[in-house]
Structure formats: structure tokens, C-alpha cells
Amino acid sequence: MEGDCLSCMKYLMFVFNFFIFLGGACLLGIGIWVMVDPTGFREIVAANPLLITGAYILLAMGGLLFLLGFLGCCGAVRENKCLLLFFFLFILIIFLAELSAAILAFIFRGNLTREFFTKELTKHYQGSNDTDVFSATWNSVMITFGCCGVNGPEDFKYASVFRLLTLDSDEVPEACCRREPQSRDGVLLSREECLLGRDLFLNKQGCYTVILNAFETYVYLAGALAIGVLAIELFAMIFAMCLFRGIIQ
């Protein structure tokens, strides 16, 4: 009976570690996606280190869980006491680190305010300057989503650097201009009328809602995965210790 129980724990340990392996791969994938996001949202909040820190934590935790899941599977199948003990201690450290990352993600979500984005835009935006990463990223977002500013075109009335560079000749940047719906090259309806602030030729929608939804998509996804991985890790630690004690006896 004791042998059957030990064998059952061994295979349960293997199953849990296989799920940890998959969870680590998912977290690793999300972390990579955040870092190489083609729409460039990362650069918009580059002044806030929480997003970058969170992405690196996802990468680190995903990579560790990926390797640790493989290690746990080997320890369970081979019934190696050293591997099991190392697995237990290591996964305990990761468990505590992930709790810290969850708190960090919660704090970061609170910083995604309309006021924060508006402040960053009015302070740093430089118009069509492609050499400035912040401005180029904002231009990419506004063109991609057909929006203008954080709240709307009126944001650029208070963008000090933009107003200085354009000598107040343009009401809005070119990225705010509406484009021909059927045009693959993004031909503007009327650049001149748009830059003069004519409503018919510029996008009136602010980008805040679009950006917030995009961030919340992978924040919630990462949070759901983290909760699932934490639960699996907890059971894996229990099975690892039970299997370790069973091997000793």
C-alpha cells in the first residue's frame, strides 16, 4: 500500500510539474510580448519604471518556472532526493517572488490614470520627430488606432515642446489626421485642413481608452496565469515534500 501511495505521489508530482512547465512557458511568452510589443506602448510609459520592471519579472519568473518544471519532472521520475529538496526550496523562493510581482502589478495598474498619460504627453511630445522614441511611439499609436492625444486634439494646446517646435503654426500633429479608409498607404484626407484643426479632417477620439484596454488585456491575462501557477506551485511543493519523506522512509 505504501509503495502504491509513493508511486501515486510520484506521478502527481510529475503532472503538477508539467503544468508548472507550461505556465512558465506562458509567462515567458507574455513577458517577451510586452518587451517587443509592435505598437510600442512600453515607450509611452518609459518614465515609469514599474512597467519595465514588471516585464523583466515576467521574463525571469517564466524562464525559472520553465526550467524548474523540467527539473521537478526529472526529480519525480528518478526519485532523486537532492533534486526534490532543491526543487522544494527553489520553488518556495519563486512562490514568494511571484507574490511580490502580483503586488507590483496591482500598484502599476493604479498608475494607469488619464492624468499620468496627459502629463507625460504634454511634457515630452515633440511632434513628427522620428528620432525621439517617445514621440514616434505616440505617433504610431495614434495612426494605428485612429485616435488623437490622450483625451482628444485639445491636449496639444498644452504640449509645450510641440508648440515650441511648430511655432504654434499647427493645432495638432500629422498623426492625428484622418486617412482615406480604402487607402493602404494611409493617404491623408487633407493635411492642411487637419493641421489647422478642422474637425472633419482629424480624429477626435482620445487614445486613453484604447491604451488602457490594451494594458488591461495582458495585465489581467498575466494575473490569471500567475494565480493558476501559484496554486499549482503550492500543490507541487506539498507533493515534493511528501515524496521526499516517502523516499527517506
UniProtKB/Swiss-Prot annotation:
Gene Ontology BP term (one): regulation of sprouting angiogenesis
Membrane topology: Multi-pass membrane protein
Keyword terms: Glycoprotein, Membrane, Transmembrane, Transmembrane helix
TM region(s), chain numbering: 14-34, 50-70, 84-104, 224-244
Positions annotated with a glycan in the UniProt record: 111, 129
PANTHER family: TETRASPANIN (PTHR19282), TETRASPANIN-18 (PTHR19282:SF249)
Family: Belongs to the tetraspanin (TM4SF) family.
Name the record gives this protein: Tetraspanin-18
Source organism: Bos taurus (Bovine)
Underlying gene: TSPAN18
